[in-house]
Amino acid sequence: MIWHVQNENFILDSTRIFMKAFHLLLFHGSFIFPECILIFGLILLLMIDSTSDQKDIPWLYFISSTSLVISITALLFRWREEPMISFSGNFQTNNFNEIFQFLILLCSTLCIPLSVEYIECTEMAITEFLLFVLTATLGGMFLCGANDLITIFVAPECFSLCSYLLSGYTKRDVRSNEATTKYLLMGGASSSILVHGFSWLYGSSGGEIELQEIVNGLINTQMYNSPGISIALIFITVGIGFKLSPAPSHQWTPDVYEGSPTPVVAFLSVTSKVAASASATRIFDIPFYFSSNEWHLHLEILAILSMILGNLIAITQTSMKRMLAYSSIGQIGYVIIGIIVGDSNDGYASMITYMLFYISMNLGTFARIVSFGLRTGTDNIRDYAGLYTKDPFLALSLALCLLSLGGLPPLAGFFGKLHLFWCGWQAGLYFLVSIGLLTSVVSIYYYLKIIKLLMTGRNQEITPHVRNYRRSPLRSNNSIELSMIVCVIASTIPGISMNPIIAIAQDTLF
């Protein structure tokens, strides 16, 4: 009898929870329709994996890619709509947030075809890999629209947990296990630091958690210039710094890049920076509105350290992935210039444009590294010597992406950096822009050093890895070629396309 009553109570409680969830989706689902599509795709992946055999593997890729493409389409259809706040103020939808969500979806859409051949050759578990990628994408999208401190903490944790699992996906690899352990420990420490900063912000504002209400609370309590806000700013800057990985919060980056599977590195190298940049712009610009000079100084220090250390240490690297890790540290220094400039002088517009180009340049480079690594089993920069003699298409496409990363004209990277530096110069960041220009010249050196190796034709310099190089017989090679071609074309867009891209980005400002 007791069991029967408990069972009825359980059914009633479950029904209430289901009805409440249905009510939320019914009245708020339109605000998170792209996210709902990804959730539906995740459910389909689980259902197919639990009810089918290995012959349905192409369906897993198809469902993942289709859900991402439909989410992008839903975002584009919602473009230019009025800003909306939903879920009791926890989530905000506007053009500024949506363009960052678009960039995250674009990264994931390009990373899935880039991963197909790698997964087939290494016999990795496919379903779990796709589930983690989609869930991380979902966490990044929620972070872009987060409007309160709780959501800003929970959303990146969703992204981070999937990132830890992806980085340690090849559990038999000692380097992967070591990288995951460092990533997990430093990620947990940074989350604790971030929450501690939030607690100071929460207390100083009189118990408010919504971003705009925090500003109102600071005005009401007259605490906007208090030491507590300075303490909160320091802790939050350190916490967000781990996600952006500028120096000196970069220690995890080279090890994770080197030890993780290459498609995972490609995914994390762009999505984490896009999501963290979206979060940083909102946190610094809204709750710390009265401390703008203080957080500008903090970010300027991070940008200078990142540009100098990242590009100088990249010169000494012998591993291709570690070189790109330090290169990404330098690249985030350029992005921080746009965050500092902010809403004035098109700072956000230039930052968004450069991040779009950075996605194409970086993913195009990693697509070539995946192809070369699967055929040779090496990641050493010297082993790329003479690749042009065996695979001219791979060598030329890699060279174009590297030149674009270095910022040589007339490639997209040059015009992206030019507009970003010009906005910083107009905002009076003369020293910061000068450091950016000098370190860009340094980055060109180590990129050209790799290109020289690629194009060398002397037999004594060609390594055995290149001599034994063979093209892949797998049909899945077409998917990585497609992803690479898209990235290379986007990386070589001439400057004539800058004006419409900048114009679209300007429409995303607050």
From Swiss-Prot:
<feature type="transmembrane region" description="Helical">
    <location>
        <begin position="418"/>
        <end position="438"/>
    </location>
</feature>
<dbReference type="InterPro" id="IPR001750">
    <property type="entry name" value="ND/Mrp_TM"/>
</dbReference>
<dbReference type="Pfam" id="PF19530">
    <property type="entry name" value="Ndh2_N"/>
</dbReference>
<feature type="transmembrane region" description="Helical">
    <location>
        <begin position="24"/>
        <end position="44"/>
    </location>
</feature>
<dbReference type="GO" id="GO:0008137">
    <property type="term" value="F:NADH dehydrogenase (ubiquinone) activity"/>
</dbReference>
<keyword id="KW-0521">NADP</keyword>
<feature type="transmembrane region" description="Helical">
    <location>
        <begin position="124"/>
        <end position="144"/>
    </location>
</feature>
<feature type="transmembrane region" description="Helical">
    <location>
        <begin position="484"/>
        <end position="504"/>
    </location>
</feature>
<dbReference type="GO" id="GO:0048038">
    <property type="term" value="F:quinone binding"/>
</dbReference>
<dbReference type="GO" id="GO:0042773">
    <property type="term" value="P:ATP synthesis coupled electron transport"/>
</dbReference>
<keyword id="KW-0793">Thylakoid</keyword>
<comment type="function">
    <text>NDH shuttles electrons from NAD(P)H:plastoquinone, via FMN and iron-sulfur (Fe-S) centers, to quinones in the photosynthetic chain and possibly in a chloroplast respiratory chain. The immediate electron acceptor for the enzyme in this species is believed to be plastoquinone. Couples the redox reaction to proton translocation, and thus conserves the redox energy in a proton gradient.</text>
</comment>
<keyword id="KW-0472">Membrane</keyword>
<feature type="transmembrane region" description="Helical">
    <location>
        <begin position="57"/>
        <end position="77"/>
    </location>
</feature>
<keyword id="KW-1133">Transmembrane helix</keyword>
<keyword id="KW-0520">NAD</keyword>
<feature type="transmembrane region" description="Helical">
    <location>
        <begin position="347"/>
        <end position="367"/>
    </location>
</feature>
<dbReference type="InterPro" id="IPR010096">
    <property type="entry name" value="NADH-Q_OxRdtase_suN/2"/>
</dbReference>
<feature type="transmembrane region" description="Helical">
    <location>
        <begin position="99"/>
        <end position="119"/>
    </location>
</feature>
<feature type="transmembrane region" description="Helical">
    <location>
        <begin position="323"/>
        <end position="343"/>
    </location>
</feature>
<feature type="transmembrane region" description="Helical">
    <location>
        <begin position="227"/>
        <end position="247"/>
    </location>
</feature>
<keyword id="KW-0874">Quinone</keyword>
<protein>
    <recommendedName>
        <fullName>NAD(P)H-quinone oxidoreductase subunit 2 A, chloroplastic</fullName>
        <ecNumber>7.1.1.-</ecNumber>
    </recommendedName>
</protein>
<dbReference type="InterPro" id="IPR045693">
    <property type="entry name" value="Ndh2_N"/>
</dbReference>
<keyword id="KW-0813">Transport</keyword>
<feature type="transmembrane region" description="Helical">
    <location>
        <begin position="183"/>
        <end position="203"/>
    </location>
</feature>
<comment type="similarity">
    <text>Belongs to the complex I subunit 2 family.</text>
</comment>
<keyword id="KW-1278">Translocase</keyword>
<keyword id="KW-0812">Transmembrane</keyword>
<dbReference type="GO" id="GO:0009535">
    <property type="term" value="C:chloroplast thylakoid membrane"/>
</dbReference>
<keyword id="KW-0150">Chloroplast</keyword>
<feature type="transmembrane region" description="Helical">
    <location>
        <begin position="395"/>
        <end position="415"/>
    </location>
</feature>
<feature type="transmembrane region" description="Helical">
    <location>
        <begin position="149"/>
        <end position="169"/>
    </location>
</feature>
<feature type="transmembrane region" description="Helical">
    <location>
        <begin position="295"/>
        <end position="315"/>
    </location>
</feature>
<keyword id="KW-0934">Plastid</keyword>
<dbReference type="Pfam" id="PF00361">
    <property type="entry name" value="Proton_antipo_M"/>
</dbReference>
<keyword id="KW-0618">Plastoquinone</keyword>
<dbReference type="GO" id="GO:0019684">
    <property type="term" value="P:photosynthesis, light reaction"/>
</dbReference>
<comment type="subunit">
    <text>NDH is composed of at least 16 different subunits, 5 of which are encoded in the nucleus.</text>
</comment>
